[in-house]
Amino acid sequence: MKYTISVKASPQDSKATKTVIDLIYELLERKHLIERVFFQHDGALQALSTGETAVGQEHLLSLWKSLADLDIELAVCISSAAKRGVSQKSNSLADGFELVGLGQLISAIEASDRYIEVF
C-alpha cells in the first residue's frame, strides 16, 4: 500500500512527532510505500533548521533527516512555512525538506491508498 502522511503537529509536541516517525518506519518495514510526508500548519516548524527538543529527548530533526536519506519526500507547505518563518532564503529550512504548494498534498493523496493526518 502507498501512504501519504500529513503532519500538523508542532515539534514541541514531541510525542506526536515521535509516534509518526515510528509509524513511518513500521510501514516501511512492512514493505509499504510512503508517497509523501506533508507538513502544514504548525507542522511546518518541523522543518526549521534550528529545531531543538527538550533535554533527554531524541533530536527530532535528525530523525526526519534519516527518513529523507531513505528517499522519503518531506514536503512543507510553503504558505504555512512562510507564516512561521521557515524559508530557503533565510536558510531556516532544514536539509532534506522541500517547500511546495498545497497541490502537492492533493496529488499525493490521489496517488495513495491511504491518507493519515497527525495533529
Predicted regions: what is each one?
Residues A16-R30, V37:
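Histidine-anchored nucleotide/phosphate-binding helix
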Residues T50-A54, N91-A94:
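Short glycine-enriched, charge-decorated loop/helix-capping segments at active-site entrances
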Residues R84-S112, I116-E117:
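C-terminal structural segments of small proteins and small subunits
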Residues Y3-K18, Q46-E52:
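Short, glycine-rich nucleotide/cofactor-binding loops
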Residues E35-H41, L74-I78:
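Short internal beta-strands
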Residues I24-Y25, L61-K65, I106:
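Short amphipathic alpha-helical segments and helix-helix/interface helices
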Residues T53-S80:
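A glycine-rich helix N-cap at a beta->alpha junction
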Residues A44-A47, K83-R84:
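Short, active-site-adjacent cap segments at secondary-structure transitions
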